[in-house]
């Protein structure tokens, strides 16, 4: 059976551009990276996290002041992998705008909320879901207790991050994350995860008329 990842990569469109040295082909994601657009798609795990962090650091090195756009469509995943992306977003100098397309669940919603203030957006039919971290462990009782305490520590830290970015009280965040909480784009705006729900890309302002 063919590897589904290999199949997917073979389906990624190529973009051909004319340069002074002739034609140059890019896969579509590399071409968009040139425009400072990063995609966070699929489950959040170590491999994907490393690629996102590397792209953020590269774009910072290329221009430490120019905005980076992050498009998010993710069901969430590994907490530590998501926190690696989150910390890098806060660490680098360029402002990072976030936009939810499809869904931003679990760690995906945290990354959506982590965008630069007034630069966090959602498309109208996107869905956002927040909840507390989960984990399953087996082994000796002492080890299970240690892992359970670590989950509680992570839960507290994630709550604090949501408080910081949403403006909600700690109690409100704790109550919201107690179970899976599904939000429409407008509800996510009211909750403070995004700043604006957008249907169309804003048009460029018309140039000022020239003086006679």
Curated annotation (Swiss-Prot):
EC number(s) stated in the UniProt entry for this protein: 3.4.21.92
Pfam families with a match to the protein in the record: CLP_protease
GO biological process, any: protein quality control for misfolded or incompletely synthesized proteins
Keyword field contains Protease: yes
Keyword terms, alphabetized: Cytoplasm, Hydrolase, Protease, Serine protease
Catalysed conversion reaction: Hydrolysis of proteins to small peptides in the presence of ATP and magnesium. alpha-casein is the usual test substrate. In the absence of ATP, only oligopeptides shorter than five residues are hydrolyzed (such as succinyl-Leu-Tyr-|-NHMec, and Leu-Tyr-Leu-|-Tyr-Trp, in which cleavage of the -Tyr-|-Leu- and -Tyr-|-Trp bonds also occurs)
Protein name: ATP-dependent Clp protease proteolytic subunit
Source lineage: Bacteria, Pseudomonadati, Pseudomonadota, Alphaproteobacteria, Hyphomicrobiales
Encoding gene, per UniProt annotation: clpP
